[in-house]
Amino acid sequence: MEALGADVTQGLEKGSLITCADNTGARELKVISVHGYSGTKNRHPKAGLGDKITVSVTKGTPEMRRQVLEAVVVRQRKPIRRPDGTRVKFEDNAAVIVDENEDPRGTELKGPIAREVAQRFGSVASAATMIV
């Protein structure tokens, strides 16, 4: 996985409810764990923009509900700082469901995704309509 070019402050923690930004049938996701997170004892795992997370589908089609899947965070409300000094934040927290090869399971992505996510996950960027 490629390093991010921005200083990403983690805006999501374990148990956060986020929207699903693709057309897989899931509408709302709950963060269960964060891949590669090694924290201190009794500290909640935190995820930020471009992190791979394990989620549970809380709202969506009956086939998708209650499934445990992998996802990538594509938008977060907490501002991130880019190397040129600009800060970027989005209106909502959103993720895209991916398979084991980190390809998106949906065919289209709703809303914009961050440039940092596009650099790290090229297949997610190819399905995106707008990159900010």
From Swiss-Prot:
A Pfam family: Ribosomal_L14
Record InterPro entries: Ribosomal_uL14 (IPR000218), Ribosomal_uL14_arc (IPR019971), Ribosomal_uL14_CS (IPR019972), Ribosomal_uL14_sf (IPR036853)
Gene3D superfamilies for this protein: Ribosomal protein L14
Coiled-coil region list: none
Assembly and oligomerization: The L3/L14/L24e cluster may contact the 16S rRNA in 2 intersubunit bridges. Part of the 50S ribosomal subunit. Forms a cluster with proteins L3 and L24e.
Family annotation (NCBIfam families): PRK08571.1, uL14_arch
Function, in words: Forms part of two intersubunit bridges in the 70S ribosome. Binds to 23S rRNA.
Protein name: Large ribosomal subunit protein uL14
Source organism: Haloarcula marismortui (strain ATCC 43049 / DSM 3752 / JCM 8966 / VKM B-1809) (Halobacterium marismortui)
